[in-house]
Each structure stands twice: as structure tokens, then as C-alpha cells.
Amino acid sequence: MLECYQYKKGGINSINMKKKVIVQLRNFEKKDALVLSERIYQELTTAQIEDMICLWNTKQHDGKYFEMFAIVASGKVVGRLSLYSYKDKTISIGPEIFPEYRGKCFAKAAMIKAIGIAKEKGYSMISQQIRVDNEASIALHTSLGFEMVGIPFVNSKGNNVCMYEKSLR
């Protein structure tokens, strides 16, 4: 059983999913351009999104390992998840679930799969920046064994964030 967290105004509700939550992580394909256009990249043309998908599928960004996955449940793309190597043996995992699919344990199931991929690729640490006001993400990461390290700071995007880390050893 997965324990998941659903954000509600005024706090986080813990929900237990009695049924197994099955998600697939797969690389984005050109056919996913419409979903990405509707959900995230309204300002881009289909051709621009297809070009971006091709770049993602090179599995590199700035000379480092990077992979963008579609999170798929019951045949529908319900979100996306990125893996990015930013230090030797340290990786960042960035999940995003589309609003209408939140609270259904898709983020937790996808994170569990992504942690497995990171281990398979030989990473020993996951390090995340999480906005201090993102209660759902903090609850998700804490439930997966991440711990806050250091003190809150303002990142390069101007957001107040904390670092959360998890050892893979």
C-alpha cells in the first residue's frame, strides 16, 4: 500500500491507496507534443515542442546526463519527471503531475521508479531543491526518506527553497 499526500488549502491530507498504483516512465515521443502543448508549453508551436522532445531524447544537457520521462498511467500522460546529473554521483529528480491527476499517488510511484533508475546508473545521492511553500512535495520527499539539509535560501529563479537529500547507498 502506498501512502500518498493530497494538498488541500490549510494543510496536507494523508491518503492510503489500497489498490496498486501502476505508472510507466518512458521517454517522450513526438506524438506527446499535443499533451505538452495543452499542459505546459502553450506558447510554443508543435514543431518547437517536437524539437525539444528530440533534444530531451539525446539524454544530455550541458554535457551531463539528463533524461525527461513521460509519467503514464492507464495509457495517459499524467505528468513528467526529469533526471539530471549535476555533480559527480549526485542526481536531481524533478516530478511534475498535471493538476487533475494529483492526489492519486502517481508522483510517489514515479519517484520510486526514478530512484531505482538512479541506483542502476550508479548514483549515490539524490539532491533536490524544493520550494518552502510546496507542502505536498515536502511531504512526498519526506515519505521517501529524504531529509532537509542546511537552511532555506533563495535560488537562481528567485524562489525560497530548501535542499532535501537521500543517500542511495
Tell where the protein language model's regions lie, with residue ranges.
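Conserved N-terminal entry element of GNAT/NAT acetyltransferase domains
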Residues: 1-34, 38-39, 166-169
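Hydrophobic adenine-recognition pocket in adenosine-nucleotide-binding enzymes
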Residues: 28, 97, 130
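Acetyl-CoA-dependent GNAT
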Residues: 42-92, 98-100, 168
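Long, contiguous binding/interaction regions
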Residues: 83-85, 140, 161
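Active-site acidic-Proline motif in GNAT/NAT acetyltransferases
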Residues: 98-100, 104, 132-133
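Conserved acetyl-CoA-binding loop-helix of GNAT-fold acetyltransferases
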Residues: 103-116, 139-143
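Conserved GNAT acetyl-CoA-binding A-motif
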Residues: 120-129
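Conserved catalytic-core motifs of GNAT/GCN5-like acyltransferases
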Residues: 129-130, 145-163
